[in-house]
Amino acid sequence: MSIQWFPGHMHKARLEIQATLPRVDIVIEVLDARIPYSSENPMLAEMRGDKLCLKVLAKADLADPLATEDWLDHYNLLEGVQGCAVSTEDIPTIRRIKLLVERMVDRRDGKMINAMILGVPNVGKSTIINVLANRKIAKTGNTPAVTQQQQRVNISDNVTLLDTPGVLWPNLHNANSGYRLALIGSIKDLSLIHISSPRD
């Protein structure tokens, strides 16, 4: 099976992310806690380079807590990376994201911290943004591609958050990852294309 769903707005978003990243202090990458590996976009990781990164495992209330702890331990061993887990209905865990960003960047010159939030479609970025901003800024939904353009949001006096559209990579050749992304709603059903092998 090969999954090919890379609509025009995703290509545009990728170019905009590449252009904006040099001006960003930290990247907040939102992953689905149920499938952290499959929901991690390798294209975004390559673009991020050695930029500070906060890995947020969203929807942790739906995931295996022991597996979540293992993933957090893994992230916290990486250079310039920290992990945290948040639950959709647990507002305080989401608000911790701002504190972690401030701690990781450690900005002492009084300038604003510029953070960029990234992730594949439908992992919960918009819900997190709305909580951090204390108001409804981003549209939420159970279908992918709700957010289709960048928007800048002040979430505190010293942190600005740049919201980006959910972006997949052009071709997903790992069948298991593709199925998992489809199950959590990151890919539209019509995007599933079965490619027969010579033995079919």
What are these regions (language model features)?
Residues 54-55, 116:
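A structural signal for isolated positions on well-ordered beta-strands in alpha/beta enzyme cores
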